[in-house]
């Protein structure tokens, strides 16, 4: 059962509890917003990280986008950018490299 199905069935999942706690909102209110499509809690099944909710009644999220280009390929610089984003409190990070060994760069950034 996915999160939307759980919400529509009135099931408060661990993700809903965690986001409600982080956001300082009532879990039942968040459940209702998810069930009606007013909030989402995105999740990458391949990465274990904290949950972040997006939508009505939740705080604005900060996303950091980093990545190499075909002109500048410096994996260490991307790692430094990722660390700076984390230190600055970014909620999410998008690694958008288009130049160099993409798998190696992403692996390095995620390590």
Model-derived features with residue positions:
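N-terminal active-site wall of soluble small-molecule enzyme domains
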Residues: 49-50, 73-81, 100-109
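Alpha-helix-loop-beta-strand connector modules within alpha/beta enzyme cores
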Residues: 34-43, 50-64, 103-111
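Catalytic domains of carbohydrate-active enzymes, especially glycoside hydrolases
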Residues: 30-38, 79-96
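Active-site mouth loops of central-metabolism enzymes
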Residues: 8, 16-20, 58-79, 96
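Short, ordered loop/turn segments at secondary-structure junctions
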Residues: 45-46, 67, 97-101
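An N-cap/entry alpha-helix motif that binds or orients negatively charged groups
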Residues: 3-52
């Amino acid at each position: 059962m996915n999160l939307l199905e759980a919400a529509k069935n009135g099931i408060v999942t661990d993700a809903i509890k965690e986001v409600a706690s982080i956001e300082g909102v009532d879990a039942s209110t968040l459940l209702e917003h998810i069930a009606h499509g007013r909030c989402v809690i995105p999740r990458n099944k391949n990465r274990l990280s904290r949950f972040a909710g997006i939508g009505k009644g939740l705080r604005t999220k900060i996303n950091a986008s980093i990545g190499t280009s075909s002109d500048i390929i410096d994996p260490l610089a991307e790692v430094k950018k990722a660390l700076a984003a984390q230190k600055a409190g970014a909620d999410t990070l998008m690694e958008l490299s288009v130049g160099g060994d993409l798998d190696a760069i992403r692996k390095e950034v995620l390590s």
